[in-house]
């Protein structure tokens, strides 16, 4: 799938808000309000991604928005918990040393000594740094099923090779 066709989930709808078709928005973007910078929104309706335009949005105990053409509460309620997506090509381009999390999923993780630790299965934030969840190889000699590796540039993360889909880390395989 080309970047032009790739669909990225950036949030989801919460409950309806008011009687005029407004919906609460749960943003998955780093800066929650930036979800409104990405246009058009794609919403999966009956198995198909359909384009929608945001007519208006505001802050109210979180974020709420009004979609163009959605004017009554009852119709808005049918959108509760639906995902909000955008095409990947509307996201900002990053510099060579920056990555979207989605780019790291599935990458092979190896130590600087060549020991294969597994593949990136998930990533989560902590107060100080992001953490890679690496699903270990089935035949791992250390009996690990997964490893949590801090995403600390230069100290732990030595190299990220987009072409080879590989991350090199300075990490003890025993952990």
Curated annotation (Swiss-Prot):
InterPro entries with a match to the protein in the record: PRC-brl_dom, PRC_barrel-like_sf, RimM, RimM_N, RimM_N_sf, Transl_B-barrel_sf
Presence of keyword Ribonucleoprotein: no
Localization terms from the record: Cytoplasm
Record-linked Pfam families: PRC (PF05239), RimM (PF01782)
Gene Ontology CC terms: cytoplasm; ribosome
Gene Ontology process terms (BP): ribosomal small subunit biogenesis; rRNA processing
Listed GO MF terms: ribosome binding
Keyword Transcription: no
Domain PRC barrel: 95-175
Matches recorded under Gene3D superfamilies: PRC-barrel domain, RimM
Keywords: Chaperone, Cytoplasm, Ribosome biogenesis, rRNA processing
HAMAP family on file: Ribosome_mat_RimM
PANTHER family registered for this protein in UniProt: RIBOSOME MATURATION FACTOR RIMM
Similarity annotation: Belongs to the RimM family.
Function of the molecule: An accessory protein needed during the final step in the assembly of 30S ribosomal subunit, possibly for assembly of the head region. Essential for efficient processing of 16S rRNA. May be needed both before and after RbfA during the maturation of 16S rRNA. It has affinity for free ribosomal 30S subunits but not for 70S ribosomes.
Subunit structure comment from the entry: Binds ribosomal protein uS19.
Domain notes: The PRC barrel domain binds ribosomal protein uS19.
Name of the featured protein: Ribosome maturation factor RimM
Gene that encodes the chain: rimM
